Amino acid sequence: EIDLSCSNRNGSFQISDTKGKYWIQNNKFEGIGGRVDWKDRGWSSDSVYANLSIFSIDVKESQFKADSVHFYNNKSFSFPVIGEFLNKAVSGSSAEHYPVFKSYKKDIVLYNILPDVDYKGGYTLRGKDFIADGRGDASARIIINKNGKKILVANSARFSIKKNIIYSESAAIKLYFDEDSMYHPSLQFTYSQSERKLKLYRDKKGVSGAPIYNSYHQLTIDAELIEWQIDEENILLGSLPSTSVSNVNFESIASYNDELYHSLRGIDKVNPLMRVSNFVKSSGTTNFSSAEFADYAGYPLHQIEPYLMNLSNKGFLFYDVSTNRAEVQEKLYNYINSRLQLADYDVIRFKSEVTDILGDNMIVHSRLNISTKDLNINGVESIDLSNTR
């Protein structure tokens, strides 16, 4: 057995305790066994490392890749994880991103990756950074607990976990208070362990334009920002301090607006709500892909995706652009039944308008007390109610 060192003018990497053959004619080393570690990233060679099986190195290249390695991180878990390994001979800031290990499995469970925070999904170690990797199907899951009960579940294709911060550009969020919850399919997610604070940002103009759903109060809420210091009772809903006047709308999922119903149709022969409802009846599922719906509707896929996104932004369904899947919401059926006079409806809407904006802090429009479930809304000048049919 030998210790193998590979270097160029940009950097180097090492493989210890390996053996193999070097083929001069094609400049390749074919190895069996050996160990690689993360010693250059500050961890001891017996705490974070990978054992190699069969591998090949093209000495004309500056990188080395190995499949089916057994990875160990004794700081995080007590079992080996099988996956692929990559290292490059690079210098400067690029060197911080190597070595890389990526697990094959996407259902690895790690408890207390931070205090009261569990993880399930794929495992990637890029340099010194743990990447919670769900790949393309948003299967990486962060679970935050409080007093032994889960208070938040976040699903994403990827979470970045650095020191005391967990971040995702887009995560499906379910925030629990007892048996009820607030839900949104795509929010920017930040959790600070040092502050024990959760921040959820919703881009009203982007793919996350759908309103937030509150199951207890049966409301949709188009707040831009949710903040919660999880040791406190109140969840804050509001917006960023970017304008002189800030508005947040709260709307009953049993509400109906005839003008909105007709505006959805445009020049279409069939109202989109009816088309989706008919598809659900024929397919037998409320969760479907954009490709499945495009095939049913007879439209090209590039037209169906914005079609579904528009319905999502108005709260009739949730549409996940990372997976191109839709989940029909109760509001869609309420609208159809109200239009056909098959059910009662209301026009309960609250418009919260805040004008006394000071400083750079969050503009608070509403507070939800997780114990009493009271929802206090600021800046409501009037409430218009109608009689149910």
Residue ranges: model-predicted function:
Residues 1-389:
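Structural signature for solvent-exposed beta-strand/loop edge elements and short helix-capping sites
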